[in-house]
Every structure is written in structure tokens, then in C-alpha cells.
Amino acid sequence: MAIKIVNKTRSEQHILMREQRILLKAQDCPFICHLYAAQQSADRVYFITEYLLGGSLGAMIKMCGSLDINHVRFYTAEIACGLQFLHQRYIVHRDIKPDNIMLDRSGHIRLIDLGLAQDGVTSSNKISGVTGTLQFMAPEVLLEEDYDTAVDWWSLGIVVSWMAAGQSPFYHGSIRRKVIKAITRKEPKFPPWLDADVKHLLERLLRKKPEERLGVYRNIRGHRFFDTIDWEVLELKRSRPLFKPFKEILENRNMLWLEDKTPLHPMDGFSYTSPSWTRMLRRIRL
């Protein structure tokens, strides 16, 4: 298991409640990190989630530079399934990036860190706010316009570029002004050796106008890059990953037991324990 510990303040309680609510809505998705329990003490909240020991996609990219095209296809398809699950429930992630995409012990992906996610988002009920990680923000976010779930498809495009080319198509170092100018005004640049189908996919994910972005005007599953993907098998996690984490899996029976004291500022409706977590605790106590 993994434990996310967040200090509790009155001003941020609604944000913590929102994250808990979104994690519960995402419980049935095999491509999103599962919440086992949410607890609170006097001054902190605890999100207890599954431990994803395969590492992050970001770490893999740093180690490899770029990934084999079949790996890119497989990971992109699973990420797309996770995003579609969220979007069908009117949830926008807002921070899709390689470091927020983990691998489980079998090699399947999990989207993590829903702390910036927002629910209740539709094309007629947009949100605002410059939120996320600069290199992965969509133009409409940087221009401080209202936006919807289309921003996640843009971010996916940047992630795919990192996987396939080992770089961003808008890379301009760490100078914020230049990065913003490139994303909002310039066209993406790809290396000449980039796979033609990947390039075609990226050109449609990285459209400046949200309504013209693949994933918005058309289902991403129909793109030719995914012609070899059996989406029904993939959604059931019956597709065999091309990479399986080789780290030794050790059973850790050291559990965190929270102090039994009443929170100073209790958040009604926050505490939660999933049935699977209850069963796990029973097995450990035997």
C-alpha cells in the first residue's frame, strides 16, 4: 500500500473532499490508482492507496530516452481508456504527465494524483485556472480561458511525444515565457525519424482549438495508430504488457494505525474504507 499524507487546513477542506469524492468515482476503473481508505486525524488526512511498484512512466523515459513503438501504442491505449472513464463521469484530470502515470506489478498503467482533478465538468459547464505542469498545459489553460476535458487530450499528446521521441514538441528549455509562447502560438515540431502514424496522432491531439482535438471531435480509438489494439480485451486487462517490472515483490505487513482521537476540524463524510481494504486487514490480523 501507499499512503498520501496531507496537512489539513480549513481553507483546503473542500479540495480534500473533492479528491476523495473523485477517487471514489474512479474505483471501478482498472487504469486509475485505487483508494483503499481515507482517514483523518487532528491535523492531517490520509489517503491509503494501492502501491504501484512498477515505477513511473517518467522514470522509464529518463532511463530509455524513448520507447519502442509497440510500448508507446500499448501505454497510450491504456491511458486513453483511463481518461475516457474519467471524462464519461465529467471529471478532468488536469495534470496528465509521465510522472503521474505509474506501472503496476504486471506492467499495466495507472493514472495517479487526482489532487488537481475537477468533477462536474462539461462543454457547457467549463472551469478555469492555470493548473497543472507547465510543459503539459493546453493552450487554453495558459491563455486563462475557460476549458473542459479537452485539456487532458492535449496533455496526452505531450506524453506520447515524450514516449515516442524522448522530447516535447514544444521544448524551449526552462524559460517560462518561451514555453508559453511555443505552446500557444507555434506548431509542434517532430524529429524526421518519428513513426508516421505517431506523428499523425500527435498532430490531431495537439490542435490549438479544443473542439478540433482528437478525443473531442472523434473517438481516439478509431485512429489508425491503434489498428492492432483489441479495445475490449484491453479494457478487461487481458492484453499482455510488453514490459513487466522486474523488482522483487516483498510482502509488507507493517501497517499504519492512526491515533484514535477526534479531529480538531472533522470533515463530515470524508472517512472511507473500501470492502477490499477491510478484507485485507482481516487477513493480516489472522
Annotate each PLM feature:
Residues 5-27:
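Conserved N-lobe beta3->alphaC-helix segment of eukaryotic protein kinase catalytic domains
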Residues 38:
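Activation-segment/catalytic-loop signature of the eukaryotic protein kinase fold
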Residues 43-56:
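Conserved short submotifs of the Hanks-type protein kinase catalytic core
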Residues 58-67:
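AlphaC helix of the protein kinase catalytic domain
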Residues 75-76:
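Activation segment signature within eukaryotic-like protein kinase domains
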Residues 216-286:
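C-terminal regulatory tails of eukaryotic serine/threonine kinases
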